[in-house]
Amino acid sequence: MWTRKAAFTFTGGIALILIGMMISNHQMMILGLAFIAFIVVNSWVSGHGDVEVQRTLSADNLYKGDDLYVELLVTNRSRRKTQQLEVYDNVPHEMKLRSGLNQMRLNLKPGESARIRYVLRCPLRGHYSVGPVSLRYRNTFNLSVDEMYVDHHSDIIIFPQIRDVEEAFIRSRTAKMYTGATTLRTPGPGTEFYSLREYVPGDPFKNINWKAFARTGELMINEKCRDAVTDLYIILDSRDIARIGTVLKNPLEMGTVAAASLASFFIQRRDSVSLTIYDEKLSFLPPDTGDKQYFKILSSLAGVAPRGTMPLQAVTNSLAARFSRGSPVFIISSCEGDGTVPSAVRDLVGRGHEVTVLSPSSIDFERLVSRIPRMSYEVLKIERQ
């Protein structure tokens, strides 16, 4: 493709030839022919080398707010120079360039390589793709430009942030008959001996090891291993109303952080965790444990988006047969625009489940994007409580 400079040169050459013919000026005609010949010869010798592009990422999976280090290796595989080569690596607009540049002008000799390094900040969770790579070749006199794309994509998943969860002895009221081959070597309520520790005020006297007290003269407590794996169910509200607020602060974002933190805590305890997301449809991930289940949960949370208006009662009715008897249930929802929440919670409690509702206040998030009078805000908070 010709540049503006080449177009003006070609047009000027044609004009000089025509004007020279009209006024019988051979010198002007020769000058016009020189311009045309210059364009033709330049087009004949122009071109570019065979360029190979490789991209390396510091990680394929990151947490929200982390930095992604990107390195782009550009190699000239041909036997000619690339002349003026512009390289631009396309990045998602949700990511911010923290340091370095994702574009560079190069002039590579045959077999020569160059590296482009830059750092991206990942402020939003989701599934993203870095690429493709845009290449623009300019010849020596900047008369022609060739543009092309290298279809090289690098997929990356940004997980929600993980917050610390305080220790909580949450367990199923009904022990599982078959817990598999997982050995639970962590302290908690149970029957199998784990270790001895010093007495702390508030410990039950029935757990005091009197033989150790007679031998050492200090009160020692018998720590027990947790008896069985607990099936834990997390229900996340992803309805359209969960988008209230800003992009970074809204009920859905807070809900994904809470769900990811709970899943991390209980999977580290070697419990089985299930995730249910409801919006316009119902997505159910059966309970399981281990790193594979943890990755499935984080991947599901990374791709969740607000849509739909499914009520909670429909969710609990559909999943009632899949819930293990007496298992804890966490409901993460703003509870706005859904009058079935109280009846759904009562049904779960009636079936013997220990229900915990985590409800981010949509009123506080709405106040970030709209002007709510102070008095109205206080009234809405009282009504919500």
Identify what each model region corresponds to.
Residues M1-G49, P311, F323-P328, C335-Q385:
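Von Willebrand factor type A / integrin I
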Residues T3-R4, N250-P251, G290, M310-L312:
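Secondary-structure junction/capping motif
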Residues Q27, F35-D291, P328-I332, G339, ...:
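An amphipathic, basic-hydrophobic helix/alpha-beta surface used to engage anionic
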Residues K211, A305-T309, S333:
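Short, flexible loop segments at the rims of nucleotide/cofactor-binding pockets, characterized by
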Residues T289-K292, R371-P373:
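Short low-complexity, flexible loop/linker segments enriched in glycine and/or proline
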Residues K292-S327:
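Von Willebrand factor
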